[in-house]
Every structure is written in structure tokens, then in C-alpha cells.
């Protein structure tokens, strides 16, 4: 595992997020039928090896028509790996579209027909070399709701056992461990900007504080 002094140490005080069931009822109970859009037609604008783009014509709630151009994504999984000493596993990886090395939790896209948990186990092993004896599904993240179908399933993993990584020949990333408080501080200072990692950090903070509960399941490593 690569040693990384990414985070400056120091106190990080955060107020716990409200429990999910405390959201104002008006936000969830109001009928939304007056907001829906009806698809009239759909055509493929681009069909790539990984991503596809569609261009749809929709009927708006007021009867007018408009176009919706969006990316069709196979979905992905992100894993929050908890080490026995209380630290978490993270990665540093270059992301070409933004030209930066990013701090991220281990993640990867779903293969066709793949179960999200199986994908999480596979990605954790391939990218970090670790396996886990306990897993818990936390939730999901819709990454870019205005222009993409992508959904990222969020899992926690613990009971970690180290082993050799299984990176693809053309895959390059560093793995390191960090104290959660250092991760919180890095997020607060804007040093972590990856959306899935910010969402996972919110989950991590609330799970470790006891505000949010997980249903842990035993799995063979």
C-alpha cells in the first residue's frame, strides 16, 4: 500500500446529518404527476464501447414538446472499506476528462447482468487487493440526473484481508489509508471533489457516529 500524506491533520467538527425519516413530509408525500414528462420518440445519437447517448423528444406537463439528450450508463458500485484500525482505504487515480489526479473510494462499473454486490467485491479485490468478510449496502447515488442514467450503488466492507492487487495492464492507481477525520477535513477544504467520494464520506460520518445504521451481512472472503 502506498503511503500518502494527502490530508493535513487537525480537528474536524461536523454536525451529524438528520436521520432520513426526519425529512419534511411535504418533500416526499406531494403527488408529482404534474411534473412528469412523456417520451414521444427516442433515437441513438452515439453508440460507444462504454457510453451511449440518446436524443429523445418529450411532451412537457404544459403540452409543449422538448428534447432530452442524455448519456446511458451501465451503472457502477463504490466501496467504503473499513480497516480494523479505524482507517479507510482510498485511491489516487488520474482522471483524463478533468486532467487531475483524484482522491476516491474504490469503484467500478457494472458488467452486463452483474449483481452490484458481486461488482463491489470484484472491484475491491482488483483495485486494492483486499477481500472482506462483512458487507453492508448503504444506498445509491444518481450521479448526474440532468443528463445521465448513471446510478452508483454504495457498499461498506469490513473484516478486510490484504492480498495482491489484480489491476488491468493499463490501469494505474495508488492505494492508501486515511483516518476518517482527515478525510472529513480534506472534503471541507475542497481537496476532495469527486461526487461519489463526497457522498460516501457523508455516509461514513453518519455511520461512524451511530446516526445511520447498516445491515451487515457475512460473506466468504
What kind of region is each of these model predictions?
Residues 16-26:
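Short, Lys/Arg-enriched N-terminal segments with co-localized hydrophobic residues
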Residues 26-47:
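Extreme N-terminal tail/first-helix region
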Residues 42-78, 84:
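Acidic, metal-coordinating catalytic segment for phosphate/diphosphate chemistry
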Residues 66, 75-78, 109-195, 215-221:
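Unchanged
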Amino acid at each position: 500500500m502506498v503511503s500518502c500524506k494527502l490530508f493535513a491533520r487537525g480537528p474536524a467538527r461536523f454536525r451529524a446529518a438528520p436521520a432520513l425519516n426526519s425529512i419534511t413530509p411535504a418533500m416526499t408525500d406531494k403527488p408529482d404527476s404534474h411534473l412528469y414528462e412523456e417520451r414521444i420518440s427516442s433515437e441513438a445519437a452515439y453508440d460507444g464501447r462504454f457510453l451511449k447517448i440518446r436524443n429523445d423528444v418529450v411532451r412537457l406537463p404544459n403540452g409543449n414538446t422538448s428534447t432530452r439528450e442524455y448519456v446511458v450508463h451501465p451503472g457502477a458500485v463504490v466501496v467504503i472499506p473499513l480497516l480494523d484500525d479505524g482507517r479507510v482505504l482510498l485511491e489516487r487515480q488520474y482522471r483524463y476528462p478533468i486532467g487531475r489526479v483524484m482522491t476516491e473510494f474504490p469503484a467500478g462499473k457494472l458488467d452486463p447482468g452483474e449483481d452490484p454486490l458481486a461488482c463491489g467485491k470484484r472491484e475491491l479485490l482488483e483495485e486494492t487487493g483486499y477481500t472482506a468478510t462483512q458487507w453492508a449496502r448503504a444506498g445509491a447515488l444518481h450521479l448526474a440526473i440532468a443528463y445521465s442514467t448513471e446510478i452508483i450503488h454504495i457498499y461498506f466492507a469490513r473484516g478486510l484481508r490484504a492480498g495482491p492487487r489484480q489491476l488491468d495492464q493499463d490501469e494505474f492507481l495508488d492505494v492508501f489509508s486515511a483516518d476518517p477525520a482527515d478525510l472529513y477535513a480534506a472534503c471541507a477544504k475542497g481537496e476532495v471533489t469527486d461526487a461519489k467520494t463526497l457522498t460516501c464520506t457523508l455516509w461514513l460520518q453518519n455511520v461512524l457516529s451511530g446516526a445511520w445504521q447498516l445491515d451487515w451481512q457475512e460473506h466468504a472472503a
